[in-house]
C-alpha cells in the first residue's frame, strides 16, 4: 500500500477545531475521564482490538508511549468490537490481555463504537475533523481496527492514519508536534 502524505495539515491547522476538553471518556476502570486532563499534550488516539491481525501494533504503540511520555505524549486506546467481533472480551479482560501480552501502560478506555448511531462523541468529532475515504460504514467512517488520530498540544486533529501505518512510522510527526509550543 503506498504512503499518502497529507501536506495540508500544517496549512489547515489554524482552521481545525480543538478537541472538546469537556468531553468525558470512560476509562477502563469505569470512571469517566475528561479529555481536559490531556490538555497541552500530544495524543495518538487509536481504536484497538485484541483478536485482530493488527493487534501486535500494541507493542509499537507502547514503545511510542514510553519513548515520548516524559515530553508530553500519550497514546489513548479505545477497544472496539465493530470490526469482525475482534474485541469480544470484558473491559477487565481487555486490560489484562494488553498488560500481559504487550506490557501496555498507556491509558485504555472501555469498549466504544466508532461508527454508526452509537459512535462515541469523541470518534464522531475525530471523523468530522479528519474524514477518511469511503468505507463499509459510509464516508468518513473508520474502516478497521487500529485507525490512529494524531492530536496536537492545542487539541487539533493533525493527521489520520490507517491500520497498516505502523506506530514507529508516526514517530517523526510526533517529534515535530512535541517541538512545537
Where in the sequence are the language-model features?
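Extracytoplasmic electron-transfer domains, predominantly the class I c-type cytochrome c fold
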Residues: 93-101, 124
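Structural signal for short hydrophobic segments within the conserved structured cores
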Residues: 23, 107, 158-159
Amino acid at each position: 500500500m503506498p504512503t499518502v502524505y497529507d501536506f495540508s495539515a500544517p496549512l489547515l491547522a489554524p482552521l481545525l477545531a480543538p478537541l472538546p476538553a469537556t468531553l468525558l471518556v470512560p476509562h477502563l476502570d469505569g470512571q469517566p475521564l475528561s479529555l481536559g486532563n490531556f490538555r497541552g499534550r500530544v495524543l495518538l488516539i487509536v481504536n484497538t482490538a485484541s483478536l485482530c491481525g493488527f493487534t501486535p501494533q500494541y507493542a509499537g504503540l507502547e514503545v511510542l508511549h514510553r519513548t515520548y511520555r516524559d515530553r508530553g505524549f500519550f497514546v489513548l486506546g479505545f477497544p472496539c468490537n465493530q470490526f469482525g467481533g475482534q474485541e469480544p472480551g470484558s473491559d477487565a479482560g481487555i486490560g489484562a490481555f494488553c498488560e500481559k501480552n504487550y506490557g501496555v501502560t498507556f491509558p485504555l478506555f472501555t469498549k466504544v463504537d466508532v461508527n454508526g448511531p452509537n459512535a462515541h462523541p469523541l470518534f464522531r468529532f475525530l471523523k468530522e475533523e479528519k474524514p477518511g475515504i469511503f468505507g463499509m460504514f459510509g464516508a468518513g467512517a473508520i474502516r478497521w481496527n487500529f485507525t490512529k488520530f494524531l492530536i496536537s498540544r492545542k487539541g487539533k486533529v493533525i493527521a489520520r492514519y490507517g491500520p497498516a501505518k505502523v506506530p514507529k512510522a508516526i514517530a517523526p510527526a510526533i517529534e515535530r508536534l512535541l517541538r512545537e509550543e
